[in-house]
UniProtKB/Swiss-Prot annotation:
The lineage of its organism: Bacteria, Pseudomonadati, Pseudomonadota, Alphaproteobacteria, Rhodobacterales. Pfam families: SQS_PSY. Its cofactor is ATP; Mn(2+); Mg(2+). Involved in the biosynthesis of carotenoids. Catalyzes the condensation of two molecules of geranylgeranyl diphosphate (GGPP) to give prephytoene diphosphate (PPPP) and the subsequent rearrangement of the cyclopropylcarbinyl intermediate to yield phytoene. Signal peptide: none annotated. Its EC number is 2.5.1.-. This is Phytoene synthase. It comes from the Bacteria. It is an enzyme of class 2 (transferase). Pathway: Carotenoid biosynthesis; phytoene biosynthesis. The gene is crtB. Belongs to the phytoene/squalene synthase family. PANTHER family: BIFUNCTIONAL LYCOPENE CYCLASE/PHYTOENE SYNTHASE. Keywords: Carotenoid biosynthesis, Magnesium, Manganese, Metal-binding, Transferase. GO terms for molecular function: 15-cis-phytoene synthase activity; geranylgeranyl diphosphate synthase activity; metal ion binding; squalene synthase [NAD(P)H] activity.
């Protein structure tokens, strides 16, 4: 059980650091809301610790430390930090499969490498780790292990991350980061390296953004078919999360896909309206027949997450994939230290 003092720290972290999720979480039942806030607080702290350091060597070191912290959490001896203790309680109570938070750490390792993503599949592989894994963990918190529900939760995670990528193109470029499919950029005559050196809201970059958001919209649409597989009192919160993040893409579109000179956002009032609308939508959709699209196969990039969550593999050793990612970072760290 999560200590109340730790829970209060987690609530404050999300209230001030993730407005969209905080708004959606308000309509989740308490039995899911508090563990979800603890999960998101751990993810937020982990992301900030990697994102806020400047030098590549420091980012690599931050990811390596996170790997050790996750090891301690699954060993039942979390570090003396509220988010670690709270997440350790969640892991124990809900039998959280270790592959899911490990996937998140692998995504952070990719961030630390400064990796580029050449194809849509590459972008989805990254989004699977930093967002779809969280969607699968949310299903675990709702005590849902149905593979179809997990696949649709992963669709939602992919779509939400694509919305974030589309919103943050300019901000990321100015920080030397690039998450758009570079082959799409090349098709538009955009040299990725030149774009990072001087990001401009050209017609080509707007078309790439529109294309990515169209893909996100298709995933949001398919994800919505899975809401019926969730506990009734959880449906409004999950629908709200999807609507709030989809609204980010709508704001980007409203700005004619200029994500370089402006950063799209939704107002607090708009978020609250979407939350209220989701409560009504959840009731209405419960009266409709289940869509056959709910049974669609998971995207190949998230299949391992669906499998891990469905089969309750709680305490494996560190996965070979994560070990490889961490070893690559260690080697890179040593190389940077020698420069």
């Amino acid at each position: 059980m999560i200590a109340e003092a730790d829970m209060e720290v987690c609530r404050e972290l999300i209230r001030t650091g993730s407005y969209s999720f905080h708004a959606a979480s308000r309509v989740l039942p308490a039995r899911v809301r508090d563990p979800a806030l603890a999960l998101y607080a751990f993810c937020r702290v982990a992301d900030d610790e990697v994102d806020e350091v400047g030098a590549p060597r420091d980012k690599a070191a931050a990811v390596l430390k996170l790997g050790d912290r996750l090891e301690d959490i699954y060993a039942g001896r979390p570090r003396n930090a509220p988010s670690d203790r709270a997440f350790a309680a969640v892991v124990e109570e809900f039998e959280m499969p270790r592959e899911l938070p490990e996937a998140l750490l692998e995504g952070f390792a990719w961030d630390a490498e400064g990796r580029w993503y050449h194809t849509l599949s590459d972008v989805q592989a990254y989004s699977a780790r930093v967002a779809a894994a969280v969607g699968a963990m949310m299903c675990v918190l709702m005590r849902v292990r149905n593979p179809d529900a997990l696949a649709r939760a992963c669709d939602l995670g992919l779509a939400m991350q694509m919305s974030n990528i589309a919103r943050d193109v300019g901000e990321d470029a100015r920080a030397g980061r690039l998450f758009l499919p570079t082959d799409w950029m090349v098709e538009e005559g955009i040299d990725p390296q030149a774009f990072l050196a001087d990001p401009q809201p050209t017609k080509g970059i707007r078309r790439v953004t529109e294309r990515l958001l169209n893909r996100a919209d298709r995933l949001y649409w398919r994800a919505a078919t899975g809401v019926r597989l969730l506990p009734f009192d959880c449906r409004p919160g999950i629908m709200a999360a999807g609507k709030i993040y989809a609204a980010i893409g709508a704001e980007v579109a409203k700005a004619k896909y200029d994500n370089i000179t402006r950063r799209a956002h939704t107002t607090k009032g708009r978020k609250l309206w979407l939350v209220a609308n989701s409560a009504m939508s959840a009731t209405a959709t419960s009266m409709l027949p289940l869509s056959p699209r709910v049974h669609a196969k998971p995207e190949p990039e998230v299949a391992h997450l669906v499998d891990a969550a469905a089969h309750r593999n709680l305490h494996p050793e560190r996965s070979e994939v994560l070990i490889s990612a961490l070893m690559a970072l260690k080697a890179r760290d040593r190389g940077l230290a020698m420069d």
